[in-house]
Amino acid sequence: LLDLDGTLIDSYPGILASCLAALRALGHEPDETLDIRRTIGSPLEDIMQILLRSYGDDRVGEAVAAYRQHYGESGLLGSVPYPGIRKSLEEMKRTGLRIYLATSKRAIFASRILDHLKFATYFDGIDGSVPSGELDHKPELLAHILSKHSLSPSHSLMVGDRRYDISGAHAVGMRALGVLWGYGTRDELETAGADQLVDSSADLAGTVLSMLNGKQSL
């Protein structure tokens, strides 16, 4: 199971643009140099709550709606794959691994991004958050994916760049590989208990295959 933002793609420019647009839609004048890298990977509601706090504003729902409108119109196209990711996906697919996307991003946005980058064909399933909010957090999302696709936790692996990916995987009985080219730090991933870390996106496929030892899920 692969995370999206900070794992497969650098989505920061588009996410930042949509966050700024959401704050402006609520009447605020945000700093254009705002750095939100460390919040990426959190549920969107949590990100907006953090951003609105400095304005004494609690209109989280309105901010989320404004963000999603802007992101759906233009923000999602500001994503670029990390070096070597396409080759890693090709290599993993070639070995027969089943590959699933597991992102806190809205599933419809994730699908559009993968289609835009021509990554969709590598995936056996694309899952993300849904309008009802029931899959906003990683443990619930991963449990849903495992059940939906009849996957065994002990034969599967979660790959991500934030502590939410690691703790979410462990909560449902999966191992977790932390990637160091995304938005989380080595300390964050180690503290969360990542089973292994990988430094370079070019080494992703090799590390995944080594951890799985030929087992047929990802």
Indicate where each model-derived feature is located.
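N-terminal helical cap/lid subdomain that shapes the substrate entry/recognition surface
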Residues: 1-87, 95, 108
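Non-catalytic pre-domain segments flanking phosphatase-related domains
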Residues: 1-2, 214-218
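Phosphate- and divalent-cation-binding pockets in alpha/beta enzyme and binding domains
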Residues: 18, 47, 84, 109-112, ...
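Substrate-recognition/cap helix-loop segment adjacent to the acidic, metal-dependent catalytic center
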Residues: 24-26, 47-54, 78, 86, ...
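Short acidic capping loops at alpha-helix termini that bridge into adjacent secondary structure
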Residues: 30-35, 58-59, 121-125, 153-157
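Short beta->alpha linker loops
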Residues: 39, 43, 80-84, 105, ...
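Structural recognition of alpha->loop->beta junctions
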Residues: 118-128, 188-208
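Acidic, Mg2+-coordinating phosphoryl-transfer loop and its flanking beta/alpha structural elements
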Residues: 157-198
